[in-house]
């Protein structure tokens, strides 16, 4: 009797295997891995709204990511640039987005959701 189990198959196109984000229905904070190499935990209790807009940089730079997702909290605004960001928007709507971080551009073709850049701007210094 063979008791060996096959290793789980992973695919970059599967949202569960995407290195740009993860989903967890039990999280209380969004972990933002910004491009400045800092990690920030923003509590969903301070979430205000999210806004999906076209990336205006596309007009000047044809290789720029096509979408921009703004995630606003009471003390910070997170800007996510990429493609296929609708899945992130849905996860935020349910407070299930566990983390978000950028991935190298070479993975963009294999990922349904590709995050090209993540920046954070704090709106209040002393809270």
Feature map (PLM): residue ranges:
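A short, compositionally biased
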Residues: 22-28, 62-67
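Phosphoinositide-dependent membrane-docking surfaces
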Residues: 42-58
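Short, surface-exposed polybasic-and-hydrophobic patches located at secondary-structure transitions
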Residues: 57-88
């Amino acid at each position: 009797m063979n008791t060996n189990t096959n290793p789980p198959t992973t695919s970059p196109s599967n949202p569960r295997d995407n290195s740009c984000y993860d989903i967890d229905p039990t999280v209380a904070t969004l972990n933002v891995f910004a491009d400045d190499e800092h990690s920030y935990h923003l509590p969903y209790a301070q979430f205000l709204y999210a806004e999906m807009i076209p990336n205006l940089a596309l007009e000047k730079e044809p290789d720029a990511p096509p979408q921009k997702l703004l995630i606003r909290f009471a003390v910070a605004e997170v800007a996510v640039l990429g493609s296929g960001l609708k899945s992130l928007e849905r996860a935020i709507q349910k407070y299930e987005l566990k983390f978000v971080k950028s991935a190298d551009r070479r993975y963009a073709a294999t990922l349904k959701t590709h995050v090209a850049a993540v920046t954070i701007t704090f709106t209040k210094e002393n809270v």
